[in-house]
């Protein structure tokens, strides 16, 4: 009985809508004069009846869903709003707002917002899709897409814009052909041209980088700013493979990458014959090289290395080093380098084995002090000689 009454009420509502409010002519529908209010159950079942799609409303309230030509102030739906042209004001739905034209104001939905152009804010639980220009902000739980945006894109997974001027923030990845401002992602940023800052948890990639790249790996064809990372692959930049020896480790391998003015250094060293044991190091540093003449560079470096004896990783031994030297070009792709270094070794004294090994490894000391019950620091001046391949 209850179900039968519901069916009768819906049918009556539809009939009244069609007869009382569906009398406008085609000419008047095309002109789309605004009505103060639309009430809808679902699209075409409401106060505008079969003329809903060609009628513009200042306010539209839709129990499940509704369709309008334009909205001039506000639209609310439990599930779905459909607008054939423009929305000016506020649009909210539980699932989706599908607007084909301009959105000026605020769009919010549980899953999806769409627009052709945007001036204001799009907020969605899953996705925001803007076909052309966006001026304002797009915020979504998963993805934000816009042909161009001046403002901010924030998403949990992925942001895309052919042109972005402002800020792209993503939980996973950002992509822009031409980016001005900031790209920040936990995994990867990709831009053809970036004028500003790229910050990524793993990889930054750009054809042309004007500004700063900060990530584990930075990749660019050309960089007119700086790249800060463990590995910086700049096609027109600075790449050197270095074999060297110093007072602690007679065999060291390092990869220097980035730009001459600022590059990263990843290094490893080994001393297999140390007291019938194996001593080795792994380190990271930053360096800068300045031309003194066409064939001579001045090198300045700061580095940190972890020292391990006989694979005892639990012993915390840190070597901090400042190096100043010169790099002399020999012939194509080959140079030699030598210089002096100031060294500070902070090593563990919590067990006798490590304490004795580190005391024997350090060649001599200028300063030696106890930091606490478990740490000791020793300092000395050392040197390095190297051959480098560009």
Task: Enumerate the predicted regions with their spans.
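Residues that define the transmembrane beta-barrel architecture of outer-membrane proteins
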Residues: 55-57, 70, 117, 148, ...
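Residue-level detector of the transmembrane beta-barrel scaffold of outer-membrane proteins
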Residues: 60, 75, 89-91, 107, ...
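Repeated loop/turn-to-beta-strand initiation elements of outer-membrane beta-barrel proteins
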Residues: 102-103, 118-119, 133-135, 149-150, ...
